Each structure stands twice: as structure tokens, then as C-alpha cells.
Amino acid sequence: MLYQSSIGSVVLAAALLMSPASAQVYPDWSGQWRGTVFRYDPSKPVGRGQEAPLKEPYRLIHEASMADQAAGGQGLYLSSARCVPMGMPWQMYAFFAMEFVFTPTTTFVLSEAMTAQTRRIYTDGRAWPEYQDALFTGYSIGKWIDEDGDGKYDVLEIETRYMRVPRIYDQSGIPFHEDGEAVIKERLFLDKADPNILHNQMTTIDNALTRPWLVERIYRREPKVIWTETNCVEDNDIVVIGNEDYRLSRDDGLLMPRKKGQKPPDLKHFNQAQN
């Protein structure tokens, strides 16, 4: 192994953990942020052409996932059914609250999704490791940049590799290539005209795509930070059996189909009757 997305609400808060002498170098990302605009490709007008530039057969895999979801199934969206962490890049779409914690050597991205999903972005100048276990969040190396030369960092550039596969780009089921060689490059920066707007431009390079794919997430700052917990297991009424997922009735505890025409599972070892 080499190198190893719908509008949601996002909360981002920055805590600066460093000496007073160095604190002024970092941008002010304090406060709470929520997603306002999500553009699949800001270089193109809204409409056709915004979809992922998928090769065959990955386009067909994506279409099958969306068709299954339209029929009531999960498609390739397994996070809610199987409590699989979102990981990268989905974590940065941020359906759930996130907090940025800056240190001179590492930027931590703490997410309330799955209660405790932590992403580490190493900013200590390290090289890529010769080998790294694949992770849901991947392995990220970042660099702070002072673009306007005023002595304060403006942009955080990040490259992420070593992401676990199989992996999808968003809840619609846009698939990554199974070779695990995807690379995601990000640029995070405040809007120059409005410091209460934060941009996150993500470019994905993957062998399931015909070309590098740029998407942009835009967040708005809110004055107060509200942090809650998200637990996938609690009150989850989805039961996965084999490659199918069903719902568990809260009234009588029996399995129910999730989509029209869904066949019942083999329950011969249980007392539940099959129709």
C-alpha cells in the first residue's frame, strides 16, 4: 500500500495552546462555525458538471448506491448502519461539531461525531513515513503559510494520505478506488472581506477519478460554542445482516424491511417467524 459530502451543520472552534509570544502568529479561528455553502467545483457554474468525475465502473457503483438509498436502503452509506467513523474527507464536511486545537507541532481536529473522532495534522516539518497503517482519518501533514507577509499565518495547507478503504466521499456513496492511494489536499483560510467566513478547499486525487476533483466548504462564525455528544450506537434501530440492513421495531422487537421488496433474512436459528 502506498498512500494511504449534502449540506450539513458544522461547528468549529479554535483553542490556541502555545506561549503568549507565539500566539499572535496564528489566525483567529475562535468561536463557532456552521456550514453555509458547499460547492463541488467552484470553478464551474451550478448544475451539470458539478458531479464527481468518476471513471467506469465507479460511476455505476455510485449510481447503484443512490438507487438503493432512493428505495430505502443504505447504499454505500454505512456510517449510521454500522457505526463506521466518517474519517476523511467526510469528517471535514462536518455534519457534527468540530474543534481546532493549535500547537506549534500539531493541529488537532476534534469531532463530536462518533463521540471521539480525532484527526492529527502534523505541522512540525516531518517527512512522510516509509510505512503507515491506514486510518479512517488518514495521516495528515500540514504547513502554516503567511501569504501577505504581515507576520501572521493566513493559510493552513494540508495533505492527507493513508486512508482506509473501502471509503466513500459523502453520504451519497461516491466511491474511492480500492487501491488506497488517494491523496487529499486542503487549503483552510479566512475570507479576506469577512473574517467571520472560513473556507476549506479540498482537492482529491484518486484513481477512481478522471482528474483531480476540487470541492469547497464555506463556514460562518457564530459567537458562542455549543458542544454536544453524538453516539451512533444509542437508539440505533438499524440491524445489519450480511449485506442487507433492516430496522428493528421498537413496538414488538421484530425485524422490519427498510425498502420495498426486501427479502427477509434467514432466521432459522431463531424463533421469529418468516413470511
Model regions and ranges:
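N-terminal secretory signal peptides that target proteins for export/translocation
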Residues: M1-Q4
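Bacterial N-terminal signal peptides
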Residues: G8-S19
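Hydrophobic small-molecule pocket/channel-lining residues, especially in calycin-type beta-barrels
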Residues: A21-N275
